[in-house]
């Protein structure tokens, strides 16, 4: 029962944006920069950061489901450690959205539920498949973050600092999953993941 209560609390905090951070925000070392951007640039950056916030909501759901279904204690601990770092990402993105005068996606409950279901299925397929799913997810997220870094206005150093740290963390999580025995996913599964990501990013940019 205690475990269920704890995991329910994790879900509520992820959806509501009431997450805790263990690490300082990488943007804290930089001066405020929103006034150096035009209104259109701020709206564009807010759309990108909303996408990244949704991605971190989904990461919380995926890791939570995969942790609950993991057979091996070491895999469970690895999922838990990665989820805590992803919680930092979630809080950093939420803070940047507030600075930009924007808000998270209104569809966060839907994103969370869908990601949890996918993570549960991956976890039920076995630890090596689950770790392979983590590795592929992080590879796609790394690519996606690189694209966002290329699309940021030159004046937006604070978002850049956040996304660069997130990308470094995602690379490390993916490498750890492969090193722990994650197996490559079939090409159709990878393509399906990319398709689902495109749907999410298109909707989250605006809603």
Swiss-Prot record:
Pathway: Cofactor biosynthesis; ubiquinone biosynthesis. It catalyses: a 5-methoxy-2-methyl-3-(all-trans-polyprenyl)benzene-1,4-diol + AH2 + O2 = a 3-demethylubiquinol + A + H2O. Fe cation 1 binds at residues 56, 86, 89, 170. Fe cation 2 binds at residues 86, 138, 170, 173. This is 3-demethoxyubiquinol 3-hydroxylase. It is a peripheral membrane protein. One of its GO terms (biological process) is ubiquinone biosynthetic process. The keyword Transmembrane does not apply. GO terms for molecular function: 3-demethoxyubiquinol 3-hydroxylase activity; metal ion binding. Binds 2 iron ions per subunit. Catalyzes the hydroxylation of 2-nonaprenyl-3-methyl-6-methoxy-1,4-benzoquinol during ubiquinone biosynthesis. Its main location: membrane. Keywords: Cell membrane, Iron, Membrane, Metal-binding, Monooxygenase, Oxidoreductase, Ubiquinone biosynthesis. GO terms for cellular component: plasma membrane. Its EC number is 1.14.99.60.
